[in-house]
Amino acid sequence: METKLFSPWTLKGVTLKNRIVMSPMCMYSSYDRDGKLQPFHFTHYISRAQGQAGLIMVEASAVSPEGRISDQDLGIWSDEHIEGFASLNEQIKAYGTKTAIQLAHAGRKAELDGDILAPSSIPFDEQSKTPVQMSVDQIKDTVQAFQDAAVRAKKAGFDIIEIHGAHGYLINEFLSPLANHRTDDYGGSPENRYRFLREVVNAVNEVWDGPLFVRVSASDYTTKGLDIADYIGIATWLKEQGVDLIDVSSGAVVQARISTFPGYQVTFAEKIKEGAGIQTGAVGLITSGVQAEEILRNQRADLIFIGREFLRDPYFPKTAAEELRTSIEGPRQYDRAW
């Protein structure tokens, strides 16, 4: 049976063999606290390549040490990180899977010793540390850190870069009026609150010519926050800057009640795709091949990001193919059982 899920997808010379993306998920397993890959990471990612993911996106990797969510996060703030990522990429690609990395800065949600940084000195919640409001120089340094990280990602052989602008981390904090109370050029109007992300995208584009994704949280789930209409506008700006795809998640810039259900974020991806005229990735409680196929067939999104289902089933693509009554090639070593 011919399916959309297992059809190739090409962008800027990068072709995915199918539309299944392993979503970036922090593993908090850089045990030496130096941001470097551990043996666990190789097993974790390569097993999903053997399982025939079209694209594997490495978890949020901090562009600076103070940009980690925890001190056991991966990092890409140093040239010392390149060798490990290059080795991982080589081994993943041996199975015909493309690779991406998510560049990130945790902002006020960093759980680290010492000062943490944010657009404004507003803690995430009552239990969280109060961040230091970033100076303009610190903002410029962070933009440079994203650019330097993109250079390292290119040297390490990644096919795609994603900028993490979601889940209440630094870029999301600048975008949302709930976390950004600045009165300078980086706060106030929507255009000013977008300025930091604009500068990050421009800086990355100066050194990166491959596909560029941005992950966003398309709703703050509160009446005083941003909603899908705001993010259609943001996605339009991103498209104008040359961003190729919006990876559409939601929430987490403030504490909020979120009613989840299968595919609960797909409607956001669909509305951004239609409203901004840009390709999108759908993510969030997508757990079956039939569900993924429906999203693609009805043109609600272009790629399917699979998160926790990949943790439960490293061979999710095979499972999905069987469900859709089609077949896919597996590793040659497994031919006798595939």
From Swiss-Prot:
CDD domains (UniProt xref): OYE_YqiM_FMN
Top class in the EC scheme: oxidoreductase
Keyword Oxidoreductase: yes
Reactions the enzyme catalyzes: A + NADPH + H(+) = AH2 + NADP(+)
GO biological process: response to toxic substance
Pfam families documented for this protein: Oxidored_FMN
This protein's UniProt keywords: Detoxification, Flavoprotein, FMN, NADP, Oxidoreductase
EC numbers on record: 1.6.99.1
Coiled-coil annotated residue ranges, if any: none
Binding site for FMN: 23-26, 60, 102, 215, 307-308
Chain sites annotated for binding substrate: 28, 164-167
Entry cofactors: FMN
Top-level division of the source organism's lineage: Bacteria
Entry GO MF terms: FMN binding; NADP binding; NADPH dehydrogenase activity
Subunit note: Homotetramer.
General function of this protein: Catalyzes the reduction of the double bond of an array of alpha,beta-unsaturated aldehydes and ketones. It also reduces the nitro group of nitroester and nitroaromatic compounds. It could have a role in detoxification processes.
Similarity section: Belongs to the NADH:flavin oxidoreductase/NADH oxidase family. NamA subfamily.
HAMAP family, per the entry: NamA
Protein name as catalogued: NADPH dehydrogenase
Organism: Bacillus pumilus (strain SAFR-032)
Taxonomic path: Bacteria, Bacillati, Bacillota, Bacilli, Bacillales
Gene that encodes it: namA
